[in-house]
A protein has these predicted regions:
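Iron-sulfur cluster-binding electron-transfer modules in prokaryotic oxidoreductases
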Residues: 1-285
């Protein structure tokens, strides 16, 4: 049946290198997928302002995706957390579900609650599997060491059910190791959650996270919000925090793409703002 792809707002705009690298990696691995249409934001940015608006947007998105009858691939930790949380609310609150469906009915939509959705890291780990990925590696990263940054919402909060273990998240770490690299896990926040209300504090946290990875070959991420804070805002984070090192920041889909034979442009490393040229140079391409 294949999959339906919902990149999310941030990956389709600000962090376009994530979407581009994910699409080219999926194609290279012969994953059958198509883009979802008539979709909207997951609504999570609205949660603290209008919780009903948030619930409605996530419910609408799920109802549209349900219509494809296929499992859905998500790129964003926030989208995955939002859909998981709202699904739990709607499945447990019949009155809330009825209210949502009364609004969706105006568009001929209905929330059923049977959408199967996975973060792309889950898809790579569970559906494709480590062995198949390892067999596709053309040039590994032996001799490299990476700092692993799954992102807060990939494994928290555990009361709504997250893709990875909330105490010892391992999926992204394992996926990096099959490429031949050493890896160390870091669970510190990138600073996004406070960035929009206190930019300096957010950038300080991002800079602190970069400093923790200063003795590695780079930070491997799987969340577009981490990409904004540590890659797009790299220079600002270094300036505000006083960090003076050089730490490439890239998505796992970009790292995997290089390992399976894609070019730096195929995985859109030209769109990264952190010093990824250091990584490309050491990799020798």
């Amino acid at each position: 049946l294949g999959y339906i792809l919902y990149p999310g707002c941030l990956s389709s705009t600000d962090q376009y290198q994530y979407e581009l690298s994910a699409v080219n990696v999926l194609k290279s691995l012969n994953v059958d997928f198509s883009y979802a249409e008539n979709v909207n934001c997951c609504g999570l940015p609205l949660r603290s302002i209008n919780s009903y608006g948030w619930v409605y947007l996530s419910a609408r998105l799920m109802s549209v995706l349900e219509g494809y009858g296929k499992p859905c691939i998500l790129l964003c930790n926030w989208c995955h957390a939002s859909l998981t949380y709202v699904k739990k609310l709607l499945d447990e609150d019949e009155a809330l579900r009825s209210w949502v469906n009364s609004l969706l009915e105006r568009e001929g939509l209905k929330y059923k609650g049977d959408l199967n959705f996975k973060h792309i890291i889950q898809l790579l780990y569970e559906d494709i599997g480590l062995e198949k990925l390892r067999s596709n590696v053309k040039r590994g990263f032996k001799g490299f060491k990476f700092s692993i940054h799954p992102g807060c919402l990939y494994f928290r909060p555990n009361d709504i059910g997250r893709p990875d273990d909330s105490h010892e998240p391992h999926m992204l770490m394992d996926l990096v190791k099959i490429l031949g690299a050493d890896a160390e896990l870091c669970l510190d926040c990138c600073g996004w959650s406070i960035y929009n209300t206190n930019a300096n504090t957010g950038l300080t946290l991002a800079g602190s996270r970069l400093k923790l990875a200063s003795k590695t070959d780079g930070i491997v991420i799987a969340c577009p919000h981490g990409g904004v804070m540590m890659d797009k805002n790299y220079e600002e984070a270094c300036k505000v925090s006083g960090f003076k090192g050089d730490v490439p920041v890239l998505y796992y889909t970009q790292l995997l793409g290089l390992a399976i034979g894609l070019s730096p442009r195929d995985v859109a490393l030209n769109l990264n703002k952190s010093p990824v040229n250091l990584l490309i140079g050491k990799f020798g391409i």
